[in-house]
A protein has these predicted regions:
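Periplasmic-binding protein-like
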Residues: 76, 130-140, 194-200, 229-232, ...
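Flexible loop/hinge segments that line or gate small-molecule binding clefts
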Residues: 139-179, 278-291
Length: 351
């Protein structure tokens, strides 16, 4: 076979006596066909010169692997947050989109938990292999220095979040750095000048202080008198010194995460946006009364599935030599916790 003139799908279809559409679906690893049909098409494709095609290799591997599995291809979603922790709204959005995207690509999701007290990680990986699962999504470790002591050499694995330090896998992350810069740009366009950032130190450590780094960059474009240092909320006593920080630096808008910060400001007598603006840097639909930056957890989940499937299609497993780090940009969300631009206010007042 001339490598510059590979066989067409129609040629394979003619050889096996099946439709062109059926052959095309099998070669793209789309479920819905009997194992015998898939093997017949793969064999014919190899005989016609497809043996070295990377996708073909992945499909053939998949055919062999599914003999020990249920028919539908499966991706394991391993929850990596602390056992017993209530799942936050953003994690539910992530989970929902992981499932939806898997279905779109012809897969389904089975869920596991890394910190299941009745199952060690080594046992978990044995179960995954026994079920014929080859694709794995590690869903957001909360710790900032996690290391995996398990063999993943035969699995296509993607990690969500930056908590996993070893091994270095392909990972999908929130663009914390860009999200803060987006918020600053929007707020300054609304007339805010003194922007104060208050964040849990735990979150900053987990994200490698990306927002604090972005704050340093944003300050370079501000009058020195308007630069306010970050307020780190400590784990045990998050608001010790917070009121003093507010009085000393007098921010006209606060950027942070979580209900506790919003509540603390209200208890100190601040109302939004009359006394001070408030922006939630981890916005989701549960915060519809606030302005914020939506990290787009749904897109993060979809991208994680895409990356796992892409590895499966290329028959690539194990720890990558050069891991990808994909950052998902956040989106600015308008809300009543920040004031409107003067031009808009004037226009509305005339109506």
């Amino acid at each position: 076979m001339n490598p510059d003139n590979p066989p067409s799908i129609q040629m394979i279809a003619d050889k096996v006596g099946l439709s062109k559409a059926t052959v095309s679906r099998v070669l793209r690893n789309i479920p819905g066909h009997k194992a015998e049909t898939r093997e017949k098409i793969i064999k014919a494709a190899e005989e016609l010169g497809y043996t070295s095609h990377p996708i073909m290799s992945a499909v053939m591997s998949s055919v062999r692997f599914k003999k020990t599995s249920e028919y539908s291809p499966i991706i394991a979603e391993i929850h990596c947050q602390p056992w017993g922790r209530k799942r936050a709204w953003n994690m539910e959005i992530l989970r929902e989109h992981i499932h939806k995207q898997a279905v779109q690509l012809g897969y389904r999701i089975e869920e596991f938990h890394w910190f299941d007290p009745e199952m060690k990680p080594q046992r978990l990986m044995q179960i995954i292999r026994a079920r014929g699962i080859r694709g794995v999504i590690l869903e957001h470790f909360m710790a900032s220095n996690m290391e995996l002591d398990v063999d993943i050499s035969d699995l296509a694995v993607v990690s969500i979040g930056g908590g996993l330090r070893f091994p270095r896998l392909h990972r999908i992350e929130v663009n914390y750095f860009g999200g803060l810069l987006t918020a600053f740009k929007q707020l300054r366009s609304l007339g805010y000048k003194r922007l104060g950032v208050a964040l849990p130190r735990f979150f900053e450590t987990m994200s490698e202080f990306k927002r604090e780094g972005a704050l340093h960059i944003a300050h370079q474009d501000m009058d020195p008198s308007d630069r306010i240092p970050i307020f780190h909320m400590e784990d045990d006593e998050p608001f010790v010194g917070f009121e003093a920080w507010l009085k000393k630096y007098k921010p006209d808008c606060i950027l942070g995460v979580g209900r506790s910060l919003e509540t603390q400001l209200a208890e100190l007598g601040y109302s939004f946006p009359k006394d001070i603006g408030f922006v939630h840097l981890g916005w989701h639909p549960g915060y519809e009364e606030l302005a914020g930056v939506n990290p787009n957890w749904g897109t993060i989940g979809e991208t994680a599935v895409n990356q796992v499937v892409e590895q499966l299609n290329r028959n690539v497993c194990g720890v990558p030599e050069h891991p990808l780090r994909i950052l998902i940009d956040g989106s600015w969300v308008e809300g009543p916790s920040v004031r409107l631009p003067e031009s808009i206010t004037v226009t509305e007042s005339k109506k």
